[in-house]
Every structure is written in C-alpha cells, then in structure tokens.
Amino acid sequence: MQKYNLQPGTGFIKRRVNLAGQDPIYQQIWDECYNPKTGALFFAEHCCYTRKNGIVKYNPRDYQKEMLFLMNNHQSVVSLIGRQMGKTVTSCCYILWYAMAFSEKDILITSFGEKSAVENMSKIKSMYEYCPDFLKIPIIKNNETSLVFSNGTRVYCRPTTPKAPRGLSPAIIYCDEFAFVGGNSSAQKSLENQQEFYAAISPALSATHGKLFITSTPVSETDLFYRLWAGAINKTDDNNLDLPKDYALSKDGVLYDDQNLFHTKEDAVAFIETLPEDEKKKYAPIAIEPEGNNGFASIFADWTKDPEKTIEWKSKELKRSGAEFFAREYECLSGETVVSVMIDGKCADMKLGDLYTKLSQNNS
C-alpha cells in the first residue's frame, strides 16, 4: 500500500469536495480509501486522528490491523482486549469508514450506559472532523446520539438494552464493554440482561445479514460475553473435528497489511498469481484461525501486545491499581479465572478473585 501524507480535515462539511479538474491523485486516493475489500486499513492509516494528550494521528498496531481485518471479513467478531488498548478507537474508525463507504445503511453503537455510548459517538465525530476534507461524505444531521450522512447512512448510539435496535435495520451493531451490561446486578441478572439484548438484536441482524462486533474486558465466566468468547475460540465442529484453517497473505513478512481473506490455501495462491511479477515474491499464504464453532471470529490482546506498555509501566500500574484490577483490565483475566498457585508448599487451584482476597488478608 502506497503511503500518503494527507492534510487533516477542517471540521464538518455539508457539501462534498468536487474532485473534477483537480490533480488525478485525489481520485486515486479516494478509490483506494473506499475500496470495499482493502479500504478500511487505508482509511485507518491515512485518515484517522484520535485524542491522546491532544489530537494525534492514529497509527494502528498489529493487533488493531487484525481487528480491522476481522471486522471487514466476518459477520460476527468478539474481541477480548485489555484496557486502554484502542479497541474502541479501532471499532469507531471502522464504523466511520463503513458509514462513508456504503450508502443507505443503519449502524447502531451500544454500550453499558448512555454516557459511554455517547462518548463512543463523540470519538466518531472527532475522527470525522480531522478526516481529510476531500474524503468526507457530508453530514446532514448531527446531534448527541445520531449522525446522518448525505449518502443515506445513519449512525445511532444507545444504551445496551432490548429497546436499542427498535426502528432500525442494522448493517452493523457494535456492542462496547458487553461484559459490563447489567454490572450493578447479580451475576444471574446480568446474564439475563445480556441475553435479552442479544435476543432482541438477533432477528434484526438476521433480516439484514448485518455484522455484529462485540468488544470487552472480562468480568466473570458466567456472563454471555464469556460464553460467546468460549464458542469463538472453540475451533472444532459439532462432531469434534478441527475446523479448516483460513488463509491471509503476509506481505514482506508482515501479516494483515493485506486485508484479503481466503478459505483455502489454493485460493490464496491463485490470488498471488494474479499479481504483477515483481509483486508476487512479496506475498505468502499464511494459515490463520477460522471462525469458532458459534460463527464468531475472535481476537485476544493483552497489555503485552502494546509496545508502549513496558515492564516498568506494569510495576507502577500494579502499585496504583492492585493485582486483581490489573489482571482483569490489562491481562484479561476475570475474578472467576482459575489459576494454579503454591500455598504452604502445595499446588492448589484457586479463583483469581479468591486469591486476591487471601493475599489482601495476609498483607493486612
């Protein structure tokens, strides 16, 4: 993918920039940006800005490129990713690209509370403002909980409740921090709340063949998020046979810089053969995990995948927030996760939450 240095945008626009009579490079960039198969990564690398001690250019990490790959190539994706790892930013980036790339679509963003849902909408609006002006689809309606583009695509944000999809035919539903839905209730009530929401969105997605993206850090091993995650990482069919691998292309040894997905190695090789001779040698087919038994693709990323989070950072964060919080929020381990520990010279299995309580009592 050729790299461009594009001027940041100047805010919301009501009329599309006319590319006629301008340098042909602008039309070339437009075509690359809104290519249905490969445009999402181009958009992320060239057009997205985010707030991080000011407005900074979004530079997707390897796991974020994988997120974009999965969202663009699969109907259902569940992501177990640690705190402050950019999972929401990456999802919002994809949603903004999709909203401008495709016409007459409904997109629903949900989170465990209205405030969180509105915050995610504000991320999309900020990205739109700084997107290069000549790549923007004009916005004709803008309020706190909705955006309407001139191409007919509508984006809404709502709390994660069974009423959320009402009145919509969603092409995408994005559920952020899904494990925290019903978090102030008992474990059983939280599960019921999550199941009611899932039951409400399933018919709508089935009717539109829409996409479902779920991201979260973990809470427990009894909620619906955990069950969806467990089904997604189960790579065997109902007869307990291994599901066949999918294939992606590495380019110059880097995976996910190419965003094409293939279901057989033969298809991947055939695609490489269509490339110019000087390009063929740069590519190689790589086996990757398929969707799980429940039809969800999955991605896991803890703090170690972020090059900005060092051992020194971990040490400071452990002192600041404690072991249980760190394990759940950054290592993606819930309080229900069972770990093996040495107690009085004997190996024992213990829930992480119980271990933290025991350590706290010993230190008091």
What is the role of each PLM region?
Residues 1-336, 341-344, 349-350, 358-364:
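Phosphate/NTP-binding elements of NTP-utilizing enzymes
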